Amino acid sequence: MHFQDIISTLQRFWADQGCLLLQPYDTEKGAGTMSPHTVLRAIGPEPWAVAYPEPCRRPTDGRYGDNPNRAQHYFQFQVLIKPSPDGIQETYLASLAALGIKAADHDIRFVEDNWESPTLGAWGVGWEVWLDGMEVTQFTYFQQCGGIDCKPVSIEITYGLERLATYLQDVESIWDLSWNAERNYGDIWLPFEKGQCHFNFEGSDPERLKQLFAIYEAEASDLIEKKLPAPALDFVLKCSHTFNLLEARGVISVTERTATIGRIRTLARRVAEAWLAEREALGFPLLEGGTLPSAA
């Protein structure tokens, strides 16, 4: 199954389960969780069901394209359902079957692994899903986002698309994965991977990155004060990515790392609080019986 067909198969499957199909969010982020379609929508009482592919960036994971299984840019497929439905593990196994992976023919294990994002002030309980000895999915019941208790609890399912694809295509290197019948993964992404790694590890200017972090932090704080949580989140995500770039350059001390994560977490908490207040002021319109505000 080609890489693009894995995405479309998961999209069809989760659409049939009642999920909205959305597109990737248009700023750098380290995980699909950081999209507002997850990190904001997991907060508050309104129901939500969404599925979307998400490109992710983790600068320190780059290896100039020389490692067959590690890259600073990769893809996840993200599912968030609130409240968490009954039988979600069985539904997930059915999604694997849709990809041609039948539970009866494979060793599929749910291994306890609680999840935490220090920068988002988010955590949950759940499992890693191992397929014949390889982790392919993270299952998380969100307990908090932005330091706010999640009521009701959401279920987040995050598929590692490259890992699934290497298994389904039986290849050793992600760069050899077929994207479709004509092009492979490396044809598309390897030039960007090499160039981005040079930037991440050698080409970026640490002092300029620190200046950018301060600008993004100030912008996020100002937007929160103006009660604009959605654009404020964009700048929190920019802070997070800029911090990751500074880590890749090796210019963040242990003390600075802890303090900087704390600054981002504080912003994330303030965004979450502002988002919840905004939705509450609207009367939580996605609740049954709620009404959407009329257009101005």
UniProtKB/Swiss-Prot annotation:
<keyword id="KW-0067">ATP-binding</keyword>
<protein>
    <recommendedName>
        <fullName>Glycine--tRNA ligase alpha subunit</fullName>
        <ecNumber>6.1.1.14</ecNumber>
    </recommendedName>
</protein>
<dbReference type="GO" id="GO:0005524">
    <property type="term" value="F:ATP binding"/>
</dbReference>
<comment type="subunit">
    <text>Tetramer of two alpha and two beta subunits.</text>
</comment>
<keyword id="KW-0963">Cytoplasm</keyword>
<dbReference type="GO" id="GO:0005829">
    <property type="term" value="C:cytosol"/>
</dbReference>
<keyword id="KW-0648">Protein biosynthesis</keyword>
<dbReference type="InterPro" id="IPR045864">
    <property type="entry name" value="aa-tRNA-synth_II/BPL/LPL"/>
</dbReference>
<dbReference type="GO" id="GO:0004820">
    <property type="term" value="F:glycine-tRNA ligase activity"/>
</dbReference>
<dbReference type="InterPro" id="IPR002310">
    <property type="entry name" value="Gly-tRNA_ligase_asu"/>
</dbReference>
<dbReference type="InterPro" id="IPR006194">
    <property type="entry name" value="Gly-tRNA-synth_heterodimer"/>
</dbReference>
<dbReference type="GO" id="GO:0006426">
    <property type="term" value="P:glycyl-tRNA aminoacylation"/>
</dbReference>
<keyword id="KW-0030">Aminoacyl-tRNA synthetase</keyword>
<comment type="similarity">
    <text>Belongs to the class-II aminoacyl-tRNA synthetase family.</text>
</comment>
<dbReference type="Pfam" id="PF02091">
    <property type="entry name" value="tRNA-synt_2e"/>
</dbReference>
<keyword id="KW-0436">Ligase</keyword>
<keyword id="KW-0547">Nucleotide-binding</keyword>
